[in-house]
Amino acid sequence: MHVFYTPDIAQTLELPEEEAGHCLRVLRLGVGEEIMLTDGKGCFYRAVISAATQKRCVVKVVEKTEQEPFWKGHLHLALAPTKNMDRMEWLAEKATEIGFDELTFLNCRFSERKVIKTERVEKIVVSAVKQSLKARKPVVNEMTDFRRFMEREFTGQKFIAHCYEVEKPLLRDVLRKDEDAVVLIGPEGDFSPEEVALAAEKGFQAVSLGKSRLRTETAALVAVHLMNLTHAE
């Protein structure tokens, strides 16, 4: 069954314009056909198309199902984006398929990219939510300066994965199940010493992702996978 993202389905029984176009013009579905909706907030809706025009698709909800969370705690990934945006789009897709709650792009001292089109990333995340049959959509935040991000209050565990030669435990060994967790991943040139010091001052624990040398997007995906595996029900 085809899945469509309808964040406001509780207020209006109509697909968003872009989803309606995909449903009616691309997939050529019509009145009377059954579809599945997700609001991205934890619920699936089995629905039937009740009216359709060139740009509008009205539905009748037949059944609402709340999807139990696959993990407990809030899983937050914050990273400095790579210069090649394709790699960040790949990460957004794969991390969503695995499962996490929030994505923040960081503007660090050695960042290769200072601007992110979050609308594009948002579309990729929505597509991955539908493809992987998840009822919850990760939040995608606008790019934030590293120092400003450090001013935020975080509950639970806080980690920074950097490459400086200091003693660091493996992330997998210090993650605690059911607790909120935020992991910071730096740019290809790593975090600056000042950023590492500031993070430590704010209570972020330095961790290792293993012995391999990883690209930014690979390190980020490893972090998401470890958080998900630790917190999964």
Predicted regions and their residues:
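A generic structural signal for short beta-strands and their flanking turns/coil linkers
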Residues: 11, 31-33, 43-45, 55-57, ...
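Generic structural signal for residues in well-ordered beta-strands
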Residues: 59, 137-141, 206
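Short, ordered loop/turn segments at secondary-structure junctions
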Residues: 64, 108-111, 211-212
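RNA substrate-binding interface of SAM-dependent RNA methyltransferases
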Residues: 68-160
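Structured adenosyl-cofactor binding patch, chiefly the S-adenosyl-L-methionine
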Residues: 193-233
